[in-house]
Protein backbone atom coordinates (compact mmCIF):
# COMPACT_ATOMS: atom_id res chain seq x y z
CA UNK A 1 0.00 0.00 0.00
CA UNK A 2 3.05 2.25 0.23
CA UNK A 3 2.70 3.79 -3.24
CA UNK A 4 -1.00 4.46 -2.74
CA UNK A 5 -0.35 6.10 0.62
CA UNK A 6 1.85 8.68 -1.09
CA UNK A 7 -0.84 9.61 -3.63
CA UNK A 8 -3.61 12.14 -3.03
CA UNK A 9 -6.45 9.63 -2.94
CA UNK A 10 -7.40 9.70 0.72
CA UNK A 11 -10.41 11.08 2.58
CA UNK A 12 -12.19 10.63 5.91
CA UNK A 13 -15.48 8.96 6.72
CA UNK A 14 -17.91 8.82 9.63
CA UNK A 15 -20.84 6.58 10.47
CA UNK A 16 -24.32 8.00 9.99
CA UNK A 17 -27.79 6.47 10.15
CA UNK A 18 -29.57 6.52 6.79
CA UNK A 19 -32.96 4.89 6.23
CA UNK A 20 -32.47 2.65 9.24
CA UNK A 21 -28.99 1.54 8.16
CA UNK A 22 -25.52 2.66 9.18
CA UNK A 23 -23.57 4.23 6.32
CA UNK A 24 -19.94 5.34 6.12
CA UNK A 25 -20.28 8.89 4.82
CA UNK A 26 -17.13 10.47 3.30
CA UNK A 27 -15.90 13.94 4.19
CA UNK A 28 -12.74 15.93 3.51
CA UNK A 29 -9.69 16.13 5.76
CA UNK A 30 -10.57 19.78 6.45
CA UNK A 31 -14.06 18.77 7.57
CA UNK A 32 -15.75 19.90 4.37
CA UNK A 33 -17.78 18.12 1.73
CA UNK A 34 -16.11 15.27 -0.15
CA UNK A 35 -16.86 12.44 -2.56
CA UNK A 36 -15.32 10.03 -5.03
CA UNK A 37 -16.06 11.87 -8.29
CA UNK A 38 -13.51 14.09 -10.06
CA UNK A 39 -15.20 17.26 -8.80
CA UNK A 40 -13.90 16.45 -5.31
CA UNK A 41 -10.38 15.54 -6.39
CA UNK A 42 -8.90 18.70 -4.90
CA UNK A 43 -10.16 17.63 -1.44
CA UNK A 44 -8.27 14.31 -1.45
CA UNK A 45 -5.04 14.12 0.52
CA UNK A 46 -2.17 11.70 1.22
CA UNK A 47 -2.59 8.90 3.75
CA UNK A 48 -0.41 10.67 6.31
CA UNK A 49 -2.48 13.85 6.00
CA UNK A 50 -5.72 11.89 6.33
CA UNK A 51 -4.44 9.97 9.35
CA UNK A 52 -3.47 13.20 11.09
CA UNK A 53 -6.79 14.85 10.23
CA UNK A 54 -8.79 11.86 11.54
CA UNK A 55 -7.46 12.58 15.04
CA UNK A 56 -9.34 15.90 15.03
CA UNK A 57 -12.74 14.34 14.38
CA UNK A 58 -14.35 11.96 16.88
CA UNK A 59 -15.15 8.58 15.36
CA UNK A 60 -13.58 9.38 12.00
CA UNK A 61 -12.01 6.71 9.82
CA UNK A 62 -9.64 6.90 6.86
CA UNK A 63 -10.68 5.85 3.36
CA UNK A 64 -9.12 5.63 -0.09
CA UNK A 65 -10.67 6.39 -3.47
CA UNK A 66 -10.00 3.33 -5.63
CA UNK A 67 -7.87 4.52 -8.59
CA UNK A 68 -7.87 3.18 -12.13
CA UNK A 69 -6.32 -0.28 -12.60
CA UNK A 70 -6.86 -1.06 -8.91
CA UNK A 71 -9.64 -3.03 -7.22
CA UNK A 72 -11.09 -3.47 -3.73
CA UNK A 73 -12.88 -6.64 -2.65
CA UNK A 74 -14.92 -6.57 0.56
CA UNK A 75 -16.06 -9.89 2.03
CA UNK A 76 -18.41 -8.78 4.79
CA UNK A 77 -19.22 -10.65 8.02
CA UNK A 78 -17.34 -13.79 7.03
CA UNK A 79 -14.75 -15.75 8.96
CA UNK A 80 -11.35 -16.45 7.43
CA UNK A 81 -11.93 -20.18 7.94
CA UNK A 82 -15.19 -20.23 6.00
CA UNK A 83 -14.68 -22.57 2.97
CA UNK A 84 -15.90 -19.96 0.48
CA UNK A 85 -13.65 -17.28 1.97
CA UNK A 86 -10.68 -19.65 1.94
CA UNK A 87 -11.35 -20.41 -1.71
CA UNK A 88 -11.50 -16.72 -2.59
CA UNK A 89 -8.43 -15.69 -0.61
CA UNK A 90 -6.38 -18.52 -2.13
CA UNK A 91 -6.65 -16.73 -5.46
CA UNK A 92 -5.17 -13.45 -4.25
CA UNK A 93 -1.52 -12.97 -3.30
CA UNK A 94 -1.91 -9.28 -2.56
CA UNK A 95 -2.47 -6.92 0.40
CA UNK A 96 -5.31 -8.19 2.60
CA UNK A 97 -6.68 -6.75 5.86
CA UNK A 98 -9.47 -7.06 8.40
CA UNK A 99 -12.44 -4.76 7.95
CA UNK A 100 -13.41 -1.93 10.31
CA UNK A 101 -15.74 -4.23 12.27
CA UNK A 102 -13.08 -6.93 12.46
CA UNK A 103 -15.43 -9.62 11.14
CA UNK A 104 -14.91 -8.95 7.45
CA UNK A 105 -11.99 -9.03 5.02
CA UNK A 106 -10.64 -6.46 2.56
CA UNK A 107 -8.48 -7.31 -0.46
CA UNK A 108 -6.64 -4.60 -2.41
CA UNK A 109 -4.78 -5.16 -5.67
CA UNK A 110 -4.11 -4.32 -9.30
CA UNK A 111 -6.15 -5.34 -12.34
CA UNK A 112 -6.00 -4.70 -16.08
CA UNK A 113 -8.87 -2.31 -16.77
CA UNK A 114 -8.97 -3.28 -20.48
CA UNK A 115 -9.67 -6.98 -19.80
CA UNK A 116 -12.75 -6.46 -17.65
CA UNK A 117 -16.38 -6.68 -18.89
CA UNK A 118 -17.55 -3.10 -19.44
CA UNK A 119 -19.93 -0.87 -21.37
CA UNK A 120 -19.98 2.86 -22.11
CA UNK A 121 -22.78 5.18 -21.00
CA UNK A 122 -22.77 8.97 -21.46
CA UNK A 123 -19.09 8.81 -22.38
CA UNK A 124 -18.15 6.94 -19.21
CA UNK A 125 -16.91 3.36 -19.02
CA UNK A 126 -18.77 1.25 -16.43
CA UNK A 127 -18.77 -2.32 -15.15
CA UNK A 128 -21.03 -4.55 -17.27
CA UNK A 129 -24.64 -4.60 -16.11
CA UNK A 130 -24.41 -8.40 -15.90
CA UNK A 131 -22.53 -8.06 -12.61
CA UNK A 132 -23.19 -6.67 -9.15
CA UNK A 133 -20.67 -4.30 -7.60
CA UNK A 134 -22.47 -4.91 -4.29
CA UNK A 135 -24.12 -8.33 -4.15
CA UNK A 136 -27.51 -8.19 -2.35
CA UNK A 137 -27.26 -11.59 -0.66
CA UNK A 138 -23.70 -12.91 -0.32
CA UNK A 139 -22.27 -9.84 1.43
CA UNK A 140 -19.55 -9.27 -1.16
CA UNK A 141 -18.57 -5.96 -2.74
CA UNK A 142 -16.14 -5.57 -5.63
CA UNK A 143 -15.13 -2.04 -6.57
CA UNK A 144 -12.89 -1.31 -9.54
CA UNK A 145 -11.20 2.04 -10.08
CA UNK A 146 -12.87 4.23 -12.75
CA UNK A 147 -15.62 1.65 -13.29
CA UNK A 148 -17.54 1.75 -10.02
CA UNK A 149 -16.44 5.13 -8.59
CA UNK A 150 -16.24 4.15 -4.91
CA UNK A 151 -13.95 4.41 -1.91
CA UNK A 152 -12.78 1.82 0.62
CA UNK A 153 -12.62 2.18 4.41
CA UNK A 154 -8.96 1.39 5.11
CA UNK A 155 -7.88 -0.12 8.45
CA UNK A 156 -4.21 -1.13 8.12
CA UNK A 157 -4.98 -4.20 10.25
CA UNK A 158 -3.18 -6.55 7.87
CA UNK A 159 -3.81 -10.25 7.32
CA UNK A 160 -1.34 -10.45 4.43
CA UNK A 161 1.04 -7.48 4.41
CA UNK A 162 2.56 -7.75 0.93
CA UNK A 163 2.81 -5.35 -2.05
CA UNK A 164 -0.21 -4.94 -4.31
CA UNK A 165 -0.18 -7.61 -7.02
CA UNK A 166 -1.86 -7.94 -10.42
CA UNK A 167 -4.96 -10.06 -9.82
CA UNK A 168 -6.80 -9.56 -13.12
CA UNK A 169 -7.56 -13.27 -13.61
CA UNK A 170 -8.81 -13.64 -10.03
CA UNK A 171 -11.00 -10.53 -10.35
CA UNK A 172 -12.62 -11.89 -13.53
CA UNK A 173 -13.18 -15.26 -11.83
CA UNK A 174 -14.80 -13.61 -8.80
CA UNK A 175 -17.07 -11.57 -11.07
CA UNK A 176 -18.24 -14.69 -12.90
CA UNK A 177 -18.53 -17.00 -9.90
CA UNK A 178 -19.80 -14.69 -7.15
CA UNK A 179 -21.01 -11.37 -8.61
CA UNK A 180 -22.96 -12.39 -11.72
CA UNK A 181 -26.65 -11.40 -11.70
CA UNK A 182 -29.25 -14.23 -11.91
CA UNK A 183 -30.66 -13.04 -15.24
CA UNK A 184 -27.16 -13.07 -16.74
CA UNK A 185 -26.59 -16.62 -15.49
CA UNK A 186 -29.95 -17.72 -16.91
CA UNK A 187 -29.07 -16.17 -20.26
CA UNK A 188 -25.71 -17.95 -20.25
CA UNK A 189 -27.34 -21.32 -19.45
CA UNK A 190 -29.96 -20.81 -22.17
CA UNK A 191 -27.28 -19.95 -24.72
CA UNK A 192 -25.26 -23.01 -23.70
CA UNK A 193 -28.33 -25.25 -24.03
CA UNK A 194 -29.05 -23.87 -27.50
CA UNK A 195 -25.46 -24.54 -28.48
CA UNK A 196 -25.71 -28.14 -27.28
CA UNK A 197 -28.97 -28.64 -29.19
CA UNK A 198 -27.41 -27.24 -32.35
CA UNK A 199 -24.45 -29.60 -31.97
CA UNK A 200 -26.82 -32.56 -31.50
CA UNK A 201 -28.76 -31.67 -34.65
CA UNK A 202 -25.56 -31.32 -36.67
CA UNK A 203 -24.28 -34.68 -35.43
CA UNK A 204 -27.63 -36.34 -36.25
CA UNK A 205 -27.60 -34.92 -39.79
CA UNK A 206 -24.06 -36.17 -40.32
CA UNK A 207 -25.11 -39.70 -39.35
CA UNK A 208 -27.87 -39.77 -41.98
Question: How would you describe each model-predicted region?
Answer:
Residues 62-65, 95-101:
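Short beta-strand
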Residues 102-110:
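Beta-rich nucleic-acid/ligand-interaction surfaces
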Residues 51, 91-97:
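An amphipathic, hydrophobic-aromatic interaction surface with interspersed Lys/Arg
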Residues 22-24:
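Short linear proline/tyrosine/threonine-rich motifs used for host-factor recruitment
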Residues 6-8, 101-103:
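Short, basic and Ser/Thr-rich N-terminal targeting/leader segments
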Residues 10, 71, 94, 105:
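Residue-level detector of short, conserved catalytic/binding motifs and their immediate flanks
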Residues 51-54, 62:
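Electrostatic, structured charged patches in enzyme active sites and in nucleic-acid/phosphate-binding
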Residues 2-5, 11-17, 27-43, 47, ...:
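DNA replication initiation modules
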